[in-house]
Amino acid sequence: GSGFVAVEIPFTPRVLELSLEEARVLENLGADPSNIRFQPVKVPEPSVDETIQILKFLPDKAIDLIDEAGSR
């Protein structure tokens, strides 16, 4: 693959560069890095729960934080 992943977050298109190590891990898991942009990002449930707890006084920021973490 090219080492780049296109990520589209509503109203914010981004292109992220995969490190060589990340690309190798994805390939070992059977993922084709060139098709990653077509796959949904899965955020582990504990991460979502923890984010919501940390940001419960700023609920509008919780989704932004999850989006940002998922884009990395």
From Swiss-Prot:
Q: Which GO terms describe its cellular component?
A: chloroplast
Pfam families reported in the protein's UniProt record? AAA_lid_9
Q: What does this protein do?
A: May interact with a ClpP-like protease involved in degradation of denatured proteins in the chloroplast.
- Its main localization is plastid
Q: What is this protein called?
A: ATP-dependent Clp protease ATP-binding subunit ClpA homolog
Name the domain of life this protein comes from: Eukaryota
Family as reported in the entry's similarity comment:
Belongs to the ClpA/ClpB family.
Q: Name one GO molecular function term.
A: ATP binding
Q: What is the lineage of its organism?
A: Eukaryota, Viridiplantae, Streptophyta, Embryophyta, Tracheophyta
UniProt KW Ubl conjugation keyword: no
